[in-house]
């Protein structure tokens, strides 16, 4: 089995799934790695199990950031309307609850299934139950030792999320990696998004 990829994404939540899909669309070989046997657990429980997947009125002014232009560039590349188009492409019925909040009529599982289908369409390899024991960088290559062997890539994305819900798999892995690579981490504060 070849474990060398252009991109490895660690964390199979909403951000990790979308990042994997978009990298695949750009012609990159992608492996999405997660420690859990189930992916996208936070999506599954969001919105009371119906997944509040976007807001019609989202725009850069709704976000607080040290870089006031970050959200502008992000929204210029992918908007809530792009995601709504993806939902429609997969024939997922949804409704507006209040103030632009969009929810699935049936279940959040539809969103998870859609994201997995999009990963498959982009030839993203999904590796569940993959426990990482070490992560190193040598020149332009990352090496990731796991219980399933050694993976390597030239681009690594850490999309492990925060510490909000440990019982569904949240860990401090991303923070430990940030510390290992001397990346600045801001003070952690509870927030409602």
Task: Identify the function of each model-found stretch.
Residues 18, 22, 43, 156, ...:
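Hydrophobic/aromatic ligand-binding patch that stacks against planar heteroaromatic rings
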Residues 35-125, 130:
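Conserved N-terminal/central alpha/beta ligand/cofactor-binding core
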Residues 26, 48, 173-176:
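Glycine-rich, phosphate-binding/catalytic loops in enzymes
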Residues 118-193:
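Predominantly flavin-linked oxidoreductase catalytic cores and closely associated redox partners
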Residues 10, 45, 158-159:
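Redox-cofactor binding/interface segments in oxidoreductases and associated redox assembly factors
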Residues 19, 115, 174:
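Aromatic/hydrophobic pocket-lining residues that form π-stacking "cages" and hydrophobic walls in ligand
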Residues 5-32:
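N-terminal Rossmann-like FAD-binding beta1-loop-alpha1 element of flavoenzymes
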Residues 9, 13-14, 38, 162-164:
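Residue-level detector of alpha-helix initiation sites
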């Amino acid at each position: 089995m070849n474990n060398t990829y252009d991109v490895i994404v660690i964390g199979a939540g909403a951000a990790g799934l979308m990042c994997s899909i978009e990298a695949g669309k750009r012609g990159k070989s992608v492996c999405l790695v997660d420690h859990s046997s189930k992916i996208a657990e936070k999506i599954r429980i969001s919105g009371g199990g119906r997944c509040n997947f976007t807001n019609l009125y989202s725009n850069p002014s709704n976000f607080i950031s040290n870089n006031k232009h970050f959200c502008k560039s992000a929204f210029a590349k992918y908007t809530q309307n792009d995601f709504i188009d993806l939902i429609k492409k997969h024939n997922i019925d949804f409704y507006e609850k209040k103030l632009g909040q969009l929810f699935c009529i049936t279940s959040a599982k539809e969103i998870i299934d859609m994201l997995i289908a999009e990963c498959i369409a982009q030839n993203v390899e999904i590796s569940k139950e993959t426990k990482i024991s070490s992560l190193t960088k040598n020149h332009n290559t990352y090496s990731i030792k796991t219980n399933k062997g050694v993976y390597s890539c030239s681009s690594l994305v850490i999309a492990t999320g925060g510490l909000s819900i440990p019982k569904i798999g949240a860990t401090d892995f991303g923070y430990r990696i940030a510390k290992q690579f001397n990346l600045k981490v801001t003070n952690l504060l509870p927030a409602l998004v």
